[in-house]
């Protein structure tokens, strides 16, 4: 899938690099071309035969453009792990072959044996995709999970060229953690896909709570904040023609995404609630407790405000 600006990524890397080498394996051949500061240094060269496909891009950032050309292993590690979660079954290997700097105090004498240099390497591959992602996120939290299994589902509409993958699990904590992506880009400002998810989530949980008499007739509906308290969720949508707001691509604007996500989440979550009544009751009970705490806090604030007004007028 594309991030929305077709071909621009490699063009920009090429323009900002002192040198870039491209090796492409396709049509049974290996093709090579090199560039310097975005300008080809030769024509495309046809190489040996091959029965595999794939592309190798090697580039050297231009030190005249960037303040630093040092790559952060941890930054790359975090992004590649995220990409592996978002692309079920994809294997990503990150290797750092740079010699690590040695402090003066650690310099060995000539007669001391030196260990053979071993590059740092991490491999990411998640066969369960977002289900593994949510389990990973919750494993780092101190709170326990409300239900054991991660709720996970996916749906694709080939005619609309749109696909959705969702994974979610409630914890006993109080923080909401809803993470959204569009074509594997982190849309931390949300957008239409997140709006569809939130709307469906609130509607389905309230309907279920009413049907199961977990909310009394006189009780107000649970708010979205009540329901999402302690929730860890990842929503990943892939579209043929993504529309992002601004060049930062942190907010999705496709109107069709809202309806698609809302419909799929409504159907799948309703099915999960009906198929897992014990877990469903625990999820609703947590939301009801959040609602009660919110209302109690509001009453306490109002009482404090009234007391302050009386003391002022007195």
Task: List the model feature ranges, each with a label.
Residues 1-3, 7, 11-15, 19-314:
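GHKL-family ATPase ATP-binding module
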């Amino acid at each position: 899938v594309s991030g929305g600006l077709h071909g621009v990524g490699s063009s920009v890397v090429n323009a900002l690099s002192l040198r870039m080498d491209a090796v492409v394996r396709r049509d049974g051949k290996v093709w090579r071309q090199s560039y310097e500061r975005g300008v080809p240094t030769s024509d495309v060269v046809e190489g040996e035969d091959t029965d595999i496909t794939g592309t190798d891009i090697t580039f050297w950032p231009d030190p005249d453009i960037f303040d630093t050309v040092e790559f952060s292993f941890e930054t790359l590690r975090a992004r590649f792990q995220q990409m592996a979660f978002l692309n079920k079954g994809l294997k990503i290997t990150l290797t750092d072959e740079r010699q690590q700097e040695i402090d003066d105090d650690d310099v060995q004498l000539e007669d001391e044996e030196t260990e053979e240099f071993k590059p740092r390497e991490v491999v990411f591959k998640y066969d369960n995709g977002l289900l593994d992602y949510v389990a990973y996120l919750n494993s780092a939290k101190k709170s326990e999970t409300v239900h054991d299994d991660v709720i996970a589902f996916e749906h694709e509409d080939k005619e609309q060229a749109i696909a959705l993958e969702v994974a979610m699990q409630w914890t006993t904590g109080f923080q909401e953690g809803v993470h959204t992506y569009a074509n594997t880009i982190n849309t931390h400002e949300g957008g239409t896909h997140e709006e569809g998810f939130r709307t469906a989530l609130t509607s389905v949980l309230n309907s279920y709570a009413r049907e199961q008499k977990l909310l009394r007739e006189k009780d107000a509906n649970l708010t979205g904040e009540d329901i999402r308290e302690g929730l860890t969720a990842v929503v990943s949508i892939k579209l043929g023609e993504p529309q992002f707001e601004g060049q930062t691509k942190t907010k999705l604007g496709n109107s069709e995404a809202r309806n698609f996500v809302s419909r799929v989440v409504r159907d799948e979550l309703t099915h999960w609630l009906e198929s897992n009544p014990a877990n469903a009751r625990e999820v609703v009970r947590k939301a009801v407790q959040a609602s009660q705490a919110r209302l109690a806090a509001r009453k306490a604030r109002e009482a404090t405000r009234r007391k302050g007004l009386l003391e002022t007028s007195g």
